[in-house]
Amino acid sequence: PYTPTHAALLARRNGLRVVGSVDHDSIGAAAEMSEATSILGMGSVTGFEIRARFGEGTPLAQRKLNNPDSVGVAYMTVQGVPAPAREKVAEWLAPGRAARLERTLAMAERANQILTDLGLEPFDPQADMVGISQYANGGGITERHLLAAMASALIRGFGRGPALTEGLAQMGVEVPASLAAVLSDADNPHLMYDLLGVLKANYLDRIYIQPTDELPSAAEVVAFADSVGAIATYAYLGDVSASPTGDKKAEKFEDDFLDELFEHMESIGLRAVTYMPPRNTPEQLARIHALAAAHGMLEISGVDINQPRQRFTCEELRRPEFADLNEATWALVAHEALSSVDPSLHLLGRTGRLTPEALAERISQYAPLGRAIADGEDAAAVAARATSIN
């Protein structure tokens, strides 16, 4: 819901020192985010998120991983992209971005057929979906853009207040009890976003078209990230009991085969895992931390902002047991800035895998450098205090 500059400003106002942009199929926000954080005295981490074929040739390919919509398809992120590599990243993402747009336009036809069958006015995909996006500036089109257009059409058609929830019931949309009141509130300023979340969790499957050729393999994502000096990650979701944003229904994901998953992650060269502490239980967090340590993987934490009700603060990360995650974040800030100056200053080394002890030492060296850069010290000067691995 925010531009990169607006997101950085809100993060700063909420007391954060690091903010990032990791958009679907796009690196387009990176330059603005980096500039905004520099002005605000913050650290930044930029990259992109992408869906990839995962576990090909293994039982994982037949399982639902961290993606509620598809079997054998995983969300991955590529973070800490050096500034000189942004153009190459944009070129690599372009074919998949275009293919996803075409698939989403086909889904829009299905959504409009549903609206028409309900006697409601359909939306204009170009004006109401593509037009509200940053696609023309290199941004991506996702199901959220589609569902925003559909949600707006439903609100226009059914009207606000109880009539909306009555109309949703007529459609067969299951509205969680926790959201029934806000969806019936005619004065709700976030109504479109609230309805979008409900549609994503409980209705998207009726119009969804599975991706095919647009998806790279997970191994290809890792290889590309390594080639540009960035860090590829698997985005751990974990079994969901309740979604804080209302956009995921209770469902089982990776927890039953997490050990097997980490073995495969290591086998394809993944050297990092990312997760969101507010969305997992203490037991899940302890397990993911233990597995990451056992496999020598950098742990990256953060929370994506999908709608304006979400807070920018993350109280979990203030707890003492998560101090290492904060240090890793600062190390990642240093990685992006320093490897933009000198590619040999990659946090994890351009190749190979660090031992848990070496990784901890590397983070302790880089975290203060990330803070220095956020405080305004020139990255080229800070680079003189860093060391390369290979």
Model-derived features with residue positions:
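Charged, amphipathic alpha-helical linkers/stalks
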Residues: 84-92, 106-109, 342-363
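Non-catalytic, alpha-helical, charged scaffold/linker segments
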Residues: 84-176, 370-389
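Phosphodiester-processing cores and adjacent nucleic acid-binding clamps
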Residues: 19, 42-59, 71-79, 104-106, ...
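An N-terminally biased module of ancient metal coordination in phosphate/nucleic-acid-related enzymes
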Residues: 1-72, 196-224, 228-229, 234-310, ...
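Outer-membrane beta-barrel translocator/channel fold
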Residues: 310-318
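Short, charged low-complexity intrinsically disordered segments located at boundaries
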Residues: 135-146, 181-183, 359-364
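Active-site gating loops and adjacent loop-to-helix segments of metal-dependent hydrolytic enzymes
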Residues: 56-99, 148-206, 318-339, 346-347
